[in-house]
Each structure stands twice: as C-alpha cells, then as structure tokens.
Amino acid sequence: MCDEDVAALVVDNGSGMCKAGFAGDDAPRAVFPSIVGRPRHQGVMVGMGQKDSYVGDEAQSKRGILTLKYPIEHGIVTNWDDMEKIWHHTFYNELRVAPEEHPVLLTEAPLNPKANREKMTQIMFETFNTPAMYVAIQAVLSLYASGRTTGIVLDSGDGVTHTVPIYEGYALPHAIMRLDLAGRDLTDYLMKILTERGYSFTTTAEREIVRDIKEKLCYVALDFEQEMQTASTSSSLEKSYELPDGQVITIGNERFRCPEAMFQPSFLGMEAAGIHETTYNSIMKCDVDIRKDLYANTVLSGGSTMFPGIADRMQKEITALAPPTMKIKIIAPPERKYSVWIGGSILASLSTFQQMWISKQEYDESGPSIVHRKCF
C-alpha cells in the first residue's frame, strides 16, 4: 500500500454496526454501533456541556438519558441527517482523518434504491468534499474477501438478510432475495422466550444484555427436534450467564431455539422461507448453467452467520433441497463478521481499481447520477 496519507478509507455501514478503516489493512480500525442518541429531556445534565447528539459507543453508554435511533433500517439508510452524523463521527472521531484528503469507498445493501446511492454520493462530495468515492455492494465485497468472483453469498447482519448470487464479480439482481429477519429480530425473540422462563428484559438497555447472551451462548442445532428432546431430558445443554447486577440466569433450549428462527421464521410469526430455502430459491432463479458454481461456492457473511453449527446445518438443508448428485460447499470464513469490510479493503487497494473511482471532477460535471454509470 502506498503512503497512509493517501490511503483510501473504507466504510461499511451496517444496520447494527459501522465498520471503518484504511484500505490495505486486514481489519477495520473502528467498529461502533450505528446509533445516534438525543437527550430525552433538555438540560438534564446541567453544566455538563450537554451535546445535542451522541454517536456510537458514547450514545450506547449514555443510553439511560438518551433516545436511541438507528438511521439504517433493514440495511437501507432511512434518516440522512443522522447518517451524516455517523459519517462525521467516523471520519473525525474514529479514524481522525480529513475526508477531503482521502478517496472513500462506501458499501450499500443489495437492491438499494437508486435515489439512495445518489444521496450517498452527493453527501460525500458536497458535505465532506471527498476527492473521490465509490459505492460497492456488500455481498460482492464478502465474496471478494473469500477469494472468489463467482458464488452465492448469504449475508445476514443485524437488520436484514440477503442471498446474492454473483457471477464473475457481478451481482445478478433478478435472483437476489431479501429476508427481513436478522440479528435484531433474533435478539427480540430471545428476549421474548427468556421472559417465558420468568426473566424480564424490556428496555433498550436490557436488550443489549440479551444481545450479549445471544452472541455468547446461542448455537444452531443440526437436528432441531432431536436437540429439543435432549434439552428436555437432561441438563447437559444448560449454561449460566451472569447479569451486570450479579444475578445469574440459566439458559437451556433457548440457546438453539433463538437462531432456529433463521431456518423456521414461523417462530417469529413470519410467513417467509428460512435462510436455507431462500438460498435455494435464489440459486433456482439463476441460469441453469451457473447453478453448480453457486452450490459449490455458498459463502456465509455477516454477524448473524456467526452462530456455531450454522454451516453444518446449511450444508444439511441445502443438500436436502438440491439435486441428489450436486456438490455442495458452504464456506464460513472465520472473519466473516467483517468480510464486507475486508473485501472493500482489498478492492480499494487494487491497482486495477484506481480508474474505477468517481472523481470530484466527474461528479461536478455529471451530478449524483454518475454513480449508476460507474458503480455496478
């Protein structure tokens, strides 16, 4: 990589977490919650020099006095003022760089509305004065990070899950499937089933505790019915968890009932197909000649694919759906929580990519619609 001072910035804006850093690095420098918090009551903290908004970890730690909002819902930006605050925080507080000195690579959800990519482009050039920028599709970056250009990516984060078939580096839009079931829904579901056990979690602060329980103790069962059987007859699957106040709670079949909702959305009262069936449906929407390449290169990406056991279960479920002789391979890279960011870091540091950037000059000549001609 050339000198740090001209390194491109890579910013992956997820519904739950924002990942940011420098192209050429192997991991993001900054990872913080995609939250903007505003004081619930004006002037509670007298003389504290109260700010009118807080971003990320600071918003998280002051959540008791704030109203927290997520500007990215289901992977798509819905509140641009708050989004701008997150980007500002990313550049100036987290990375401590001047955005007008660095090209910026942003990521977007598959099937992101055209107006949204234009708005991102406009904010980068007009608010932050970046010299150059690019918008890449998250799933495509994850595939690059796994060293492939053809495959199907199951990307599941905090706010949305997508299955994205990619051929020779291009996403196939007609076959992309979206499932509005992801980490946040699983956390909510775990809150609900723990309440049935007699533990009460209701506030946004308590939701964070439940998210931690989910991340530390949940796993995907290979055979759900059999696992339920085991859980009801022995205590071998029980684990204990200490709450911040010192109380210890025990969690049993909830450990695998929670992520099971990804395979059986009916648990959440949803009509949708599970992630295995959605992946299969995506593959079946593709040309018959490329299907075997997709089955053999099914890549998991995003934080909600981090549950132990998920790859084996996917293998089993897809095998049951696919033609009998088909070779099926589920790739679950250990760094998949950050593979979108890593793919962006790889892409932005390639010498061949340098002519792909949208420059400030091109933007000034063509306006925001330039993004559709240069980023696809």
UniProtKB/Swiss-Prot annotation:
Entry-annotated residues carrying N-acetylcysteine: C2
MF term (GO), any: hydrolase activity
Alphabetical UniProt keywords: Acetylation, ATP-binding, Cytoplasm, Cytoskeleton, Hydrolase, Methylation, Nucleotide-binding, Oxidation
Principal location listed in the UniProt entry: cytoplasm
Modified residue annotations for Tele-methylhistidine: H74
GO (cellular component) term, any one: cytoskeleton
PROSITE patterns (UniProt xref): ACTINS_1 (PS00406), ACTINS_2 (PS00432), ACTINS_ACT_LIKE (PS01132)
Catalytic activity: ATP + H2O = ADP + phosphate + H(+)
PTM annotation (N-acetylaspartate): residues: D3
InterPro entries to which the protein is assigned, alphabetical: Actin (IPR004000), Actin/actin-like_CS (IPR020902), Actin_CS (IPR004001), ATPase_NBD (IPR043129)
Name this polypeptide is given: Actin, cytoplasmic
